[in-house]
């Protein structure tokens, strides 16, 4: 899992 936004957290 990479560091992303709260909305991007699903995209890992």
UniProtKB/Swiss-Prot annotation:
Keywords assigned by UniProt? Cell wall, Secreted
Q: What is its main location?
A: secreted
Q: Does the keyword Secreted apply?
A: yes
Q: Where does the protein end up?
A: Secreted, Cell wall
A cellular component annotation (GO) from this entry: extracellular region
**Domain of life of the source:** Eukaryota
Q: How is this protein named in the record? A: 26 kDa cell wall protein
Q: Which organism is it from?
A: Nicotiana tabacum (Common tobacco)
